[in-house]
Amino acid sequence: MTESVTISLDAMGGDHGPDVVAPAALAALARNPALRLILVGQAEPVRQALQRHGGQESERLWVHPASEVVAMDEPPSQALRTKKDSSMRVSIQLVKQGEADASISAGNTGALMATARYVLKTLPGIDRPAIMSTIPTKGGYAHMLDLGANVDCTAEHLFQFAVMGSVCAEAIDGVAQPRVGLLNIGEEEIKGNDQVKRACQMLTDSPLNYVGYVEGDGIFKGLADVVVCDGFVGNVALKSSEGVAGLIAHYLRAEFQRNLFTRLAGLIALPVLRSLRGRIDPRQYNGASLLGLRGIVLKSHGGADAFAFGRAIETAVLEVRKGVPRMIDQRLESLLAAKESP
């Protein structure tokens, strides 16, 4: 019998709050009989959302009250200091207390990272947690981190990100010796800033399967299973790729609607276009992991719909079953031991 997994959901976070979280939770429970979900938030609005979507509390789904909500534009320090009973914070505290195995929020990213770090603390050997997400590539998909948690990083931080990303690729995807690439402005050794060059040397000297520098266009070529960068570069790269994908979709729609012949061509190409949309649909990859914490926390996109939020739930279940924080801790410990041994 499969062991049950309990996940706490910040029901008030994101652009749509319980109107997305409630249907996503109901659908996830229908797919996974070993799953239990806690909806954390203002009790009455959450229960009303459940009823609107044909659900109610049960042995596998219940509401945990939290009186406050962190606004999407609220400064992280203010949220951490003044919103001690926020749905975001209470959801993470349930992980800390052992009542939940993981927490998911579509709320304010900065506040989520600050709160998770304050409540759960970081793993030994990890200076800063990082945000990791999955991106589509020619070969399937890859994991990329950091995506915005750490704007300025040292070489040591980048090395720690590489270890965490490698462990996740190995645990979640079952990839033996995941290929780790360092995002840079060129593949030549002379290129890059001092932090990137030092991180490159550290990775070269490590037992990780380091494949060298990866340029921006190489992210999507499937050259690496894990792409490592600082949060500033990673966030810009991710948002730029989303913008380009949106621009291409805009051009395709405009061209197919130009005249009768292009409309007919669009109808003929519809199955191909639907398949393409499914492969690059960002909803498929929703659910960014906050790695390096003493617990599992995922960030859903603020504008996610129920399908996308459901994907984040599936990722959280997988990370719980694989014991990702424990695996990161063990891998770091073994790397440090190998480094210190003569």
UniProtKB/Swiss-Prot annotation:
GO MF, one example: phosphate:acyl-[acyl carrier protein] acyltransferase activity
Enzyme class, first EC level, given as a word: transferase
EC number assigned by the record: 2.3.1.274
UniProt GO cellular component terms: cytoplasm
Subcellular location: Cytoplasm
GO term, biological process aspect, one: fatty acid biosynthetic process
Pfam family for this entry, one: FA_synthesis
Catalysed reactions, as listed in the record: a fatty acyl-[ACP] + phosphate = an acyl phosphate + holo-[ACP]
Chief subcellular location: cytoplasm
Pathway assigned in UniProt: Lipid metabolism; phospholipid metabolism
Keywords tagged on the record: Cytoplasm, Lipid biosynthesis, Lipid metabolism, Phospholipid biosynthesis, Phospholipid metabolism, Transferase
HAMAP family, per the entry: PlsX
Assembly and oligomerization: Homodimer. Probably interacts with PlsY.
Function field: Catalyzes the reversible formation of acyl-phosphate (acyl-PO(4)) from acyl-[acyl-carrier-protein] (acyl-ACP). This enzyme utilizes acyl-ACP as fatty acyl donor, but not acyl-CoA.
Family per similarity comment: Belongs to the PlsX family.
The protein's name in its UniProt record: Phosphate acyltransferase
Organism in which the protein naturally occurs: Alkalilimnicola ehrlichii (strain ATCC BAA-1101 / DSM 17681 / MLHE-1)
